[in-house]
A protein has these predicted regions:
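N-terminal auxiliary segments of SAM/dcSAM-dependent transferases
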Residues: 1-30
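Active-site beta-strand termini and strand-to-loop segments that position acidic
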Residues: 21-23, 217-220
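Glycine-/small-residue-rich active-site loops that bind phosphorylated ligands and cofactors
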Residues: 36, 182, 205
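Short amphipathic beta-strand/extended segments with alternating polar/hydrophobic composition
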Residues: 36-42
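The AdoMet/dcAdoMet-binding core of the Class I SAM-like
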Residues: 42-169, 177-178, 193, 198-215
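Glycine-centered, phosphate/nucleic-acid-interacting loop/turn motifs that mediate DNA/RNA or nucleotide
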Residues: 173
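A SAM-dependent methyltransferase catalytic signature shared across enzymes that methylate proteins
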Residues: 183-202, 218-223
Length: 223
């Protein structure tokens, strides 16, 4: 059994404990003892960014919900133009600090990219106050609509969140959501708000049989 050393930890107001742990060159973030992300399994997060940016019309304003280990943010920055603005909303300020202090080397320090803007706070609030502000919104804050890191994130995947995401997207904008597994109810909910939805199953990592699910929901073009 691997022995993981706790490098940093943080406790949120709701009592949730976030732990950054390391074993040799492996890093994980745990929430309440459950692994939320690992630097040894991030290919599907990168696929989320690549597919979302490819579906959008030359996106210049992108919102990434959840910083984590930085892989989704790095993949977005690698795909967008030099004059794009990429905002990353992260609820846990310690995660931002850990990326600066420990994790940036894993992804070539994406927080130092001049196109990157960091908002410390709930991504739902950022979406809610940003009508027609983004060409692409990526949500990688949980293990999917059913496996939540925090209970209040349910609003992101329910009517309030889907409605807010639709309103925050520009014409032909793309909402891209990472999930550990399929969710027919969420698929139908996206369609009920007028999104054109594509669901992709992608490898959790290169060579793995494990699959993760990407929801790619596109807003209809408008005048």
């Amino acid at each position: 059994m691997l022995t993981w050393a706790t490098v940093e930890s943080a406790r949120l107001a709701d009592g949730s404990e976030f732990v950054l742990a390391r074993h040799d060159d492996g890093w994980v973030i745990r929430v309440n003892s459950r692994i939320l992300m690992s630097n040894r399994m991030h290919d599907s997060e990168e696929a989320l960014a690549e597919h979302a940016i490819a579906r959008a019309d030359d996106p210049r304003a992108v919102l990434v919900g959840g910083l984590g280990l930085g892989y989704t943010l790095r993949a977005v920055l690698d795909e967008v133009a030099e004059d794009a603005i990429v905002t990353v909303a992260e609820l846990v300020p310690e995660l931002v600090a850990w990326n600066h202090k420990h994790l940036g080397v894993l992804t070539d320090h994406p927080l130092d990219d001049p196109r990157c803007r960091v908002v410390v706070g709930d991504v739902f609030d950022t979406i809610k106050r940003s009508p027609r502000a983004f060409d692409v919104i990526l949500l990688d804050v949980d293990n999917g609509p059913q496996a939540l890191a925090q209970a209040k994130n349910q609003r992101l995947y329910g009517d309030p969140g889907v409605r807010a995401c639709h309103a925050a997207l520009r014409s032909n904008g793309v909402l891209a959501v990472w999930s550990a597994g399929p969710n027919a109810r969420y698929h139908k909910k996206l369609e009920s708000f007028g999104f054109d939805v594509q669901v992709l199953r992608v490898a959790a990592r290169v060579g793995s049989r494990a699959r993760h699910v990407l929801f790619l929901a596109q807003r209809a073009p408008t005048d």
